[in-house]
Amino acid sequence: DSDESRGLGDVYKRQELTGGHPNSLGNTIKVVEHVIVKKNRINSLIKCYSSTDQIVRLRTSNAFKRIFRQKPEWFLDFKHIFLNKISKIKQSSTQWTCAQLFSELVNQLENKEQKKAKKIVSDYLNNSSDWIVLCQSMNALITFNKIDNKTIKENIKIIKKLSKDRRKAVSRLAKKLLSLIKE
């Protein structure tokens, strides 16, 4: 009996990734431990991104960060899904997760994929008001800038705007990016 035929995506949604306090991990660690044993279980976890429950999607994102940090080589088989589908989900936790994954696993992205990831992160900077999305996107730009030193300059307008943001975490990081240009 395969995991797919048993509908583990539904099990994750119903039993493991729902309920509890919205900011808690719930049973995310348990899901990670289950998936890490058998790579094909990722397919069931990916299905959780289609849940209408934003807490399920938040915990799914958290699970993927943990899985890919433990098994970074697994990202190779799923990067296209994150670049082409997951990154388009209009939820802050999903967006900051994509920014983090693209930054942390940039060495697994081919040149064309790096450009796409950079565009996604730039779009997040220009369209999000969530401070975590903004900070993780700027952190990703720092990483991309090490590969292509035009990255920060290409986003200078939004970075200058963010350097005046009322939220200290956002403005401080934007100022750091501006200082990288001057070096």
Where are these regions (language model features)?
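Alpha-helical scaffold domains
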Residues: D10-E183
